């Protein structure tokens, strides 16, 4: 008898729940069927610089070590062009600008001498991503991205111990979710960017007459850049 009551209750509740779900308003139901659509994004990013010290001593016996102890925040803005390839696949191109700063701490192990350098950057970025989306659930749809990003730093340079090359290339992996609002689609996204190149400038003729600075430069083997990007897309 109890089993029959449970079954009867389920039969009464499930159709009502299904009807309630069907009654929910689907915002922009045909938004994902467009072949091409445009948008823009704003957000912030965290920059990191992985420095590899070679441990070599200078001619006067000093050992300098450099590091970036923490991620540094910055601002980013992009435009977006999205090409629909399939129900679950989109190709996205989102050129833009990333503005940021990295602080390098340098220390001589024997004497305890320290020095800092602020590296300001203004990147022109050219990201290309493959967006892989799941199924839409009412007004939301999760997705992941995989792609690459070329960057060109247009900031001014000075004769400092660390001078970075202006170009770099990143492998990118991201995760986000589309939220379908009445008048546009809103997508919060987090992306992890892994630099593939050694961006440290090793040939430094500008430091020929600055031996104290050259000692720090020569103590570094390579430098690679990483970023975490938090973006809000409006499409």
Map each language-model feature to its residues.
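Residues on the lipid-exposed face of transmembrane beta-strands in outer-membrane beta-barrel proteins
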Residues: 40-44, 75-83, 95-97, 126-134, ...
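Flexible, solvent-exposed loop segments that connect beta-strands
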Residues: 52-68, 100-121, 154-164, 200-220
């Amino acid at each position: 008898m109890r089993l029959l009551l449970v079954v009867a209750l389920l039969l009464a509740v499930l159709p009502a729940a299904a009807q309630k779900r069907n009654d929910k308003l689907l915002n922009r139901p045909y938004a994902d069927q467009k072949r091409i659509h445009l948008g823009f994004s704003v957000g912030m990013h965290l920059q990191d610089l992985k420095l590899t010290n070679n441990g070599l001593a200078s001619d006067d016996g000093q050992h300098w070590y450099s590091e970036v102890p923490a991620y540094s925040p910055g601002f980013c803005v992009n435009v977006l062009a999205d090409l629909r390839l399939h129900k679950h696949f989109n190709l996205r191109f989102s050129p833009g600008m990333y503005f940021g700063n990295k602080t390098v701490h340098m220390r001589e192990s024997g004497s305890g001498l320290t020095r800092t350098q602020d590296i300001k950057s203004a990147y022109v970025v050219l990201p290309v991503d493959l967006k892989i989306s799941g199924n839409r659930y009412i007004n939301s749809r999760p997705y992941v991205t995989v792609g690459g990003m070329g960057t060109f730093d247009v900031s001014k340079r000075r004769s400092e111990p660390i001078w970075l090359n202006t170009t770099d290339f990143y492998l990118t992996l991201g995760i986000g979710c589309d939220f379908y609002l009445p008048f546009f689609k809103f997508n919060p996204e987090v992306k992890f960017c892994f630099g593939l190149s050694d961006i440290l400038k090793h040939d430094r003729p500008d430091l020929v007459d600055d031996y104290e600075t050259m000692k720090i430069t020569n103590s570094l083997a390579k430098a690679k850049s990483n970023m975490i990007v938090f973006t809000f897309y409006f499409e």
